[in-house]
């Protein structure tokens, strides 16, 4: 009976790790899609500044389809991983040996933390993509209004020139923001690639921690320091973003 329940637990862990690996790859691709959309936005904005082309950016229909497809796939993987975590929680609640149950709860918490990180990363990347797309739609509408105004009868050239200069100023501000987003995306991708290597190391350290309490205490201190460093890094990125925004709009 014990062997059967142990096999069930290992099977759940195997499913969780497999889904986590799939999500990691999907999120990297999803992030690259958002980054490429942002870069193309800056390039196409410069080329179309004085044109009357109102075609959506980067063949928007295909770009949107790709975005929607990837978002659905990631949401499905997150739902499946949530289900596996729920089954693992049910198993830990039914485990009868206290020492074994504590070790299982530690492992379950680690998988829950990974799920929470992936969910947060997905929603953040999705929100960035939607913001860029909405801004491009707005700028496309502005360009169309400018061209309509220029082509109309009795156009006031001076007013049109001021309008175009203001539009250029907005475009330059957008470019600064997009560069900041690109830097943040590159940093996130680098951290994502390092996370894969740290996973295996962390798993081995957890195994040692379950056997040696002193190692467990050391791991907890390492985790606290890692969270502190993450908060510091996030604060620095936030301050840099605010400074760039202040510089762009003044």
UniProtKB/Swiss-Prot annotation:
The keyword Calcium does not apply. The chain crosses the membrane at residues 230-250. It comes from the Eukaryota. It is a single-pass type IV membrane protein. GO terms for molecular function: SNAP receptor activity. Residues 9-30, 68-95 form a coiled coil. InterPro entries: Golgi_SNAP_su1. Involved in transport from the ER to the Golgi apparatus as well as in intra-Golgi transport. It belongs to a super-family of proteins called t-SNAREs or soluble NSF (N-ethylmaleimide-sensitive factor) attachment protein receptor. May play a protective role against hydrogen peroxide induced cytotoxicity under glutathione depleted conditions in neuronal cells by regulating the intracellular ROS levels via inhibition of p38 MAPK (MAPK11, MAPK12, MAPK13 and MAPK14). Participates in docking and fusion stage of ER to cis-Golgi transport. GO terms for biological process: endoplasmic reticulum to Golgi vesicle-mediated transport; inter-Golgi cisterna vesicle-mediated transport; intra-Golgi vesicle-mediated transport; protein transport; vesicle fusion. This is Golgi SNAP receptor complex member 1. Residues 41-51 have a biased composition (Basic and acidic residues). Component of several multiprotein Golgi SNARE complexes. Identified in a SNARE complex with BET1, STX5 and YKT6, in a SNARE complex with BET1L, STX5 and YKT6, in a SNARE complex with STX5, GOSR2, SEC22B and BET1, and in complex with STX5 and COG3. Interacts with GABARAPL2.
């Amino acid at each position: 009976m014990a062997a059967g329940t142990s096999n069930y637990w290992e099977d759940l862990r195997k499913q969780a790790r497999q889904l986590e690996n799939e999500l990691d790859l999907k999120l990297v691709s999803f992030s690259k899609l958002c980054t490429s959309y942002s870069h193309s936005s800056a390039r196409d904005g410069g080329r179309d500044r004085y044109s009357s082309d109102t075609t959506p950016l980067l063949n928007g229909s295909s770009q949107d389809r790709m975005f929607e497809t990837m978002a659905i796939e990631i949401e499905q993987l997150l739902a499946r991983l949530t289900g596996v975590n729920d089954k693992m929680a049910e198993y830990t609640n039914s485990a009868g040996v206290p020492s074994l149950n504590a070790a299982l709860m530690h492992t379950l918490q680690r998988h829950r933390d990974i799920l929470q990180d992936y969910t947060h990363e997905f929603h953040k990347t999705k929100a960035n993509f939607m913001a860029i797309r909405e801004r491009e739609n707005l700028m496309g509408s502005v360009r169309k209004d400018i061209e309509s105004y220029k082509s109309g009868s009795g156009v006031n050239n001076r007013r049109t020139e001021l309008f175009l200069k203001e539009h250029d100023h907005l475009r330059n501000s957008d470019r600064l923001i997009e560069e900041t987003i690109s830097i943040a995306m590159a940093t996130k991708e680098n951290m994502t690639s390092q996370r894969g290597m740290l996973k295996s190391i962390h798993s081995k350290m957890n195994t040692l921690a379950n056997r040696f309490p002193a190692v467990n205490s050391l791991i907890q201190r390492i985790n606290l320091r890692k969270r502190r460093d993450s908060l510091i890094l996030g604060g620095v990125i936030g301050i840099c973003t605010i400074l760039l925004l202040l510089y762009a709009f003044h």
